């Protein structure tokens, strides 16, 4: 079963819509430069009102490990998602969140050596792969090129859990799952009406598309 994370949650209404649709995880963006940014106070208020067994993830770009630890504790986050090359092995090990996801932005020249090296130095085995755009940590709405994605996800299978992000929406997520069989898929802009606000119909359509792709993969003819 492919897990589903709806990222860039800013309101309780959107959080509950995602949960009711079947999302397994919600992402809260604490980067001050993001149009989907939330304050720790807002995130904590939303998280306290969602049902149990939903994984809550904090997205961090420019925060120090101490700041990340403080926000994770205050908001009761299950997971810290670390964007940017600033989070090397040393700084990642200083993050005390229950679980850590390290983000890698994958262009055509992306080398898996950096993933292997990071995993070896930290013991972290959860990776999110997003499309590369110069100067942006993620959330570009662009997809990883097919050949690159196939190579990355094939090689990551022996290292850890690989999450696919980058331009995913109801119209293409099924194809992406069939292409690379990710552990999970992650979307933000693909289910929005405007940046920071979700379109609930798109969320439901996204979840249905994931479930349909999973059903196709598990059928005897697959």
Curated annotation (Swiss-Prot):
Top EC class, one word: isomerase
Keyword set includes Amino-acid biosynthesis: yes
Reaction catalysis annotation: N-(5-phospho-beta-D-ribosyl)anthranilate = 1-(2-carboxyphenylamino)-1-deoxy-D-ribulose 5-phosphate
EC numbers, comma separated: 5.3.1.24
Record keyword Amino-acid biosynthesis present: yes
Signal peptide: none
GO molecular function terms listed in the Swiss-Prot or TrEMBL record: phosphoribosylanthranilate isomerase activity
Keyword annotations of the record: Amino-acid biosynthesis, Aromatic amino acid biosynthesis, Isomerase, Tryptophan biosynthesis
InterPro entries: Aldolase_TIM, PRAI_dom, RibuloseP-bd_barrel, TrpF_fam
Database matches in SUPFAM superfamilies: Ribulose-phoshate binding barrel
Pathway membership: Amino-acid biosynthesis; L-tryptophan biosynthesis; L-tryptophan from chorismate: step 3/5
GO-annotated biological processes: L-tryptophan biosynthetic process
HAMAP family: PRAI
Family: Belongs to the TrpF family.
Protein name in the entry: N-(5'-phosphoribosyl)anthranilate isomerase
Name of encoding gene: trpF
């Amino acid at each position: 079963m492919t897990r589903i994370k709806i990222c860039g949650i800013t309101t309780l209404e959107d959080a509950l819509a995602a949960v009711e649709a079947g999302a397994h995880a919600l992402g809260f963006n604490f980067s001050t430069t993001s149009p989907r940014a939330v304050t720790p106070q807002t995130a904590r208020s939303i998280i306290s009102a969602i049902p149990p067994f939903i994984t809550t993830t904090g997205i961090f770009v420019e925060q120090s490990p101490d700041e990340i630890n403080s926000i994770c504790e205050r908001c009761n986050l299950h997971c810290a998602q670390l964007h940017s090359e600033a989070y090397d092995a040393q700084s990642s090990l200083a993050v005390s969140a229950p679980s850590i996801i390290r983000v890698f932005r994958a262009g055509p020249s992306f080398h898996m050596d950096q993933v292997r090296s990071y995993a070896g130095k930290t013991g972290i085995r959860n990776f999110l792969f997003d499309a590369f755009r110069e100067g942006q940590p993620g959330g570009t709405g662009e997809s990883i090129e097919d050949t690159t994605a196939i190579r990355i996800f094939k090689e990551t299978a022996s290292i850890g859990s690989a999450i696919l992000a980058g331009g995913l929406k109801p119209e293409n997520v099924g194809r992406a799952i069939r292409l690379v069989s990710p552990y999970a898929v992650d979307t933000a802009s693909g289910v929005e009406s405007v940046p920071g606000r979700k379109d609930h119909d798109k969320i439901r359509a996204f979840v249905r598309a994931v479930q349909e792709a999973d059903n196709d993969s598990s059928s005897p003819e697959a």
